[in-house]
């Protein structure tokens, strides 16, 4: 008959490698779910539509808005690219007309353009930004997902297309 110390020793000899193998399997398994990121199709702001003005909804202040940065994280799929767009906008207001909280809604349009320079689809996003009390700038970060067909590009614009 084996003593308790022998049983513990045998258990530890078996349990430790199994525990280590289990931890490694979890780590390897988690990394298997991470997609393989690649190069994004061209994504840029349309000349003349990268800056605009709008009116705030609380105080009626004139707000200047412009793109402050556009980047993407893309995964190639069968016939298209799954793109996650990171869009940063910079908004400024004049505090001489009031410094209380201000709110503004604005549109961003993403046009998918093919190799013949034809707009094949358009997606418009309504966004909202706030100015805190006594703050003259606001920098909302926007994340949007788009499916971009192979051979196409994305052109972003502030505002929306006339219907």
Residue map of PLM features:
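Helix-rich interaction surfaces within compact, conserved domain-sized segments
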Residues: 110, 116-163
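Generic short beta-strand segments
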Residues: 68-71, 86-92, 161
């Amino acid at each position: 008959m084996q003593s308790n110390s022998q049983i513990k020793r045998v258990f530890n000899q078996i349990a430790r490698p199994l525990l280590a193998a289990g931890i490694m399997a979890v780590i390897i398994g988690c990394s298997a779910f991470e997609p393989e990121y690649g190069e994004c199709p061209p994504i840029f702001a349309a000349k003349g539509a990268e800056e605009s003005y709008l009116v705030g909804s609380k105080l009626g202040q004139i707000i200047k808005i412009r793109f402050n940065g556009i980047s993407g994280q893309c995964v190639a799929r069968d016939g298209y690219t799954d793109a996650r767009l990171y869009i940063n906008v910079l908004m400024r207001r004049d505090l001489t007309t009031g410094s209380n909280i201000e709110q503004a809604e604005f549109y961003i349009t993403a046009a998918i353009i093919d190799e013949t320079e034809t707009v094949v689809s358009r997606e418009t996003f309504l966004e909202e930004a706030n100015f805190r009390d006594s703050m003259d700038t606001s920098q909302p970060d926007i994340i949007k997902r788009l499916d971009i067909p192979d051979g196409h590009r994305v052109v972003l614009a502030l505002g929306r297309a006339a219907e």
